[in-house]
Amino acid sequence: MKNTLSFLLTLTLLVVGSITAQAQLQQPAASPAAHVSQVVGFTKISIDYSSPAVKGRKVFGGIIKYGESWRAGANGQTIIEFSTAVSVGGKNLAAGKYSIFVTPAATGEWTIHLNKKAESIYSYMKDGKIDEAALAADDAVAVKATPSTVGATERLQYHISAGNNKVAQVTLAWETTAVSFMVDSLVDQKMEQFKSQF
């Protein structure tokens, strides 16, 4: 009788514990993970990022300071990946992954950094601020881009436009601002290389 009672008590505790564990619902992320990809020519361009919301805040010049580099997303690093070699800002980049950092400006052009190190921007912290010189030293390329005003965009979004299927336009849009850079998939160069093999 004692064994039966002990068994029933143990079984009850296991069932209640299991139900309680299943009843705990994980909250949705405030800045959900997002992914966008596009094939342009022979190249697949992919971006993995987290998508923060405006939530009534002033974004650029507010929570994102002018003149300070930013990880161009939330939570972790924003990563762009090219499946083949490409050209950005007139500089050839090898296939692979790069961190995207953006330095917004109150007026004029912004700087978009494609950084060789797929690490957190916080690895560049020095005395409580981003060490801009150290970050720039690790850039694969930094391009200047003029921001434009767009319709309200609550969540940060990236878009990749295939254009003429040779050169892609990569755009970051958030709040009422968009900024873009071009990625040349080097289709003509790759075609010439292919033809030269025969």
Protein language model annotation of sequence segments:
Residues 24-65, 117-198:
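Primarily secretory-pathway and cell-envelope proteins
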Residues 72-126:
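Mid-length scaffold segments of soluble, non-membrane domains
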